[in-house]
Amino acid sequence: MRGCLQLARWLSAAPKGTAASLTRAPFVLANAPRYFTSSASRAGSRSTATKPLSDLEKRISAIPIERYRNFCIVAHVDHGKSTLSDRLLELTGTIEPGSNKQVLDKLDVERERGITVKAQTCSMIYNHNGEDYLLHLVDTPGHVDFRAEVSRSYASCGGALLLVDASQGIQAQTVANFYLAFAQGLELIPVINKVDLPSAEPERALEQMKNSFELDTENAVMVSAKTGLNVEKLLPTVIEKIPAYGHFPVDSHELLPLLTLSSPIGDCKKPLRMLLVDSWYDSYKGVICLVRIFDGEIRAGQQVVSFATGLKYYVGEVGIMYPNETPQSVLRAGQVGYIYFNPGMKRSKEAKIGDTFTRVGFEKAVEPLPGFEEPKAMVFVAAYPVDADHFEHLEDSINQLVLNDRSITVQKESSEALGAGFRLGFLGTLHCSVFEDRLRQEHGASIIITPPSVPVKIIWKDGKEEIITSPAKFPEDEELRSKVAEIQEPYVLATLTFPEEYLGKVIELCEANRGEQKSLEYFTPTQVILKYELPLAQLVDDFFGKLKGSTKGYASLDYEESAWQTGNIVKLQLLVNKAPVDAVARIVHSSQVERLGRQWVTKFKEHVDRQLFEVVIQAAVGKKIIARETVKPYRKDVLAKLHASDVSRRRKLLEKQKEGRKRLRAVGNVVIEHKAFQAFLAK
């Protein structure tokens, strides 16, 4: 009561404005816009409009669009792309010298494996001849499994640094990345890296680039990304050689479609036209989108609309990667940066890579960009939670990772042995392995992954065609005989580069894997480029590991889709007491059946607990048994209390035990623990 009286006296003594503001406060709060995001995010978005521009933003706003340069670094695995990116960031003052290694390799799996998995971007400011230039760098993956990342990166680039290791020369993925960049019309700058190595032969590497790619090597730059030697010569070359616009040829049929740019990269005065290049998930901000602005400009608070979904969003924050997320008040035409919406996207599927956005009200004035062609999954696995209660957590984790990697396909499926799970499609086995690592590291998911398999094409006798990715959908024996005309499997054209001394072993390996030789070239007296057409099923069966073993680690491999070819394809099943275990079934070529069948039954026997009755483990194709193992039952000693001379009683007890086992085997279910499947399916 005393407290209430004191408050009343204070209010009566206070200025009228104070009391009025206090009485109005609930009304203001009740009618304020409600944003479902963190208070930190709201404070950040509100302060963007009021706080003065930072020195960085003042420098960027003073740079005209003609002084923008967007470029990427493409090369074979381990040729030094990420290390060179570090040196360029240090040279432009974006990071402190020696402050970090592989700054743009942000994922744990990238640092563990020492490879780039995700294309990462960073903006830099570089002063050349007294003028500031805004440079946008993309560090791309080198492995063939992540070529979709490389392809998407070209959408925001006008040129590329083609990097070659001076000690190794041109490798398989150097060739693949060159043709991909060349097809998109990118301006290519030859760069020879690791010239400080004792084994470096920069002149030989230059000669290879000149002969293989017909590049003008007079302007090639010799650098050592590790020591920083000559790195300062790269950026002036980028500014002089790479235009502020990109050319995308009209007849290109690569993964990227046309972006039809033959004029400067954009006009700030036109209505907003924005391309969604990538996206990822943040636990506080939700879905964050990496975008390229083609026309117009975008600020926090504006409302935009998606051409793909028709959904409208309010922009919560815009910024650039410098190298981490750095908020800005505006993104202009020609820039690449990030945005997130407030409120955010409700579902990860709303962020469609290749989608075009514009301001609400300008939909009819803006022509949407063509976007990206979806890459085709080539390798499929089934994923199940170790604990069935964690299915929803696994689903959320997969959806968040797919937001960051749209080349993965996801379908729900169920197994009698392992319960509810997912059928996942990937571009290759390394792609699959990296995804599995990210699920475990970033989301703490405990999962069971089946061995990788490839799709097959069923041609029915009525002329219809069907692509099968799951063994559960493979036709049964009767259907195969009566309704199926032909079964085809996918082939790839593999390009292998290696020293000439290993030629015999490599040819032997390819022939053993049902390969057909297409060409053989010597691009130096000691280096060979060998092209083979191989079944994709053989390629995913650790072909690269066998190739490395045959060449002592000196070989490199690249591949592309070739064609479907007829093959003797069957479904191999594992039977436990004549009941099929659906989680283990695989679609394989008949030549692999005996080896895999024996391997399966031997390995599965090690992980099945003994029962009170005999457990028979078999590998079968249709009704034909390929291999068999038996798990002996526990045996009770029924003769323990019997006198040695009572032969008839002895015989009677043994017969009774035998009959009991027969009945138990007929009605008893084999209990197979989850951990048995986990151990069996482990690599």
UniProtKB/Swiss-Prot annotation:
HAMAP family: LepA (MF_00071)
Keywords: GTP-binding, Hydrolase, Membrane, Mitochondrion, Mitochondrion inner membrane, Nucleotide-binding, Protein biosynthesis, Transit peptide
Domain of life: Eukaryota
Keyword Cytoplasm tagged: no
Binding site for GTP: 75-82, 139-143, 193-196
Function: Promotes mitochondrial protein synthesis. May act as a fidelity factor of the translation reaction, by catalyzing a one-codon backward translocation of tRNAs on improperly translocated ribosomes. Binds to mitochondrial ribosomes in a GTP-dependent manner.
A GO-annotated cellular component: mitochondrion
EC code(s) of this entry: 3.6.5.-
Subcellular location: Mitochondrion inner membrane
Domain tr-type G: 66-250
Natural source organism: Aspergillus fumigatus (strain ATCC MYA-4609 / CBS 101355 / FGSC A1100 / Af293)
Protein name from the UniProt record: Translation factor guf1, mitochondrial
InterPro entries per UniProt: EF-4 (IPR006297), EFG_III/V (IPR035647), EFG_V-like (IPR000640), EFTu-like_2 (IPR004161), G_TR_CS (IPR031157), LepA_C_sf (IPR038363), LepA_CTD (IPR013842), LepA_IV (IPR035654)
GO terms, biological process: positive regulation of translation; translation
Reaction equation(s) it catalyzes: GTP + H2O = GDP + phosphate + H(+)
Coiled coil: none
PANTHER family reported in the protein's UniProt record: TRANSLATION FACTOR GUF1, MITOCHONDRIAL, TRANSLATION FACTOR GUF1-RELATED
GO MF entries: GTP binding; GTPase activity; mitochondrial ribosome binding
Keyword Glycoprotein applies: no
Segment annotated as transit peptide: 1-43
Protein family per UniProt: Belongs to the TRAFAC class translation factor GTPase superfamily. Classic translation factor GTPase family. LepA subfamily.
Membrane topology: Peripheral membrane protein
EC class of the enzyme, as a word: hydrolase
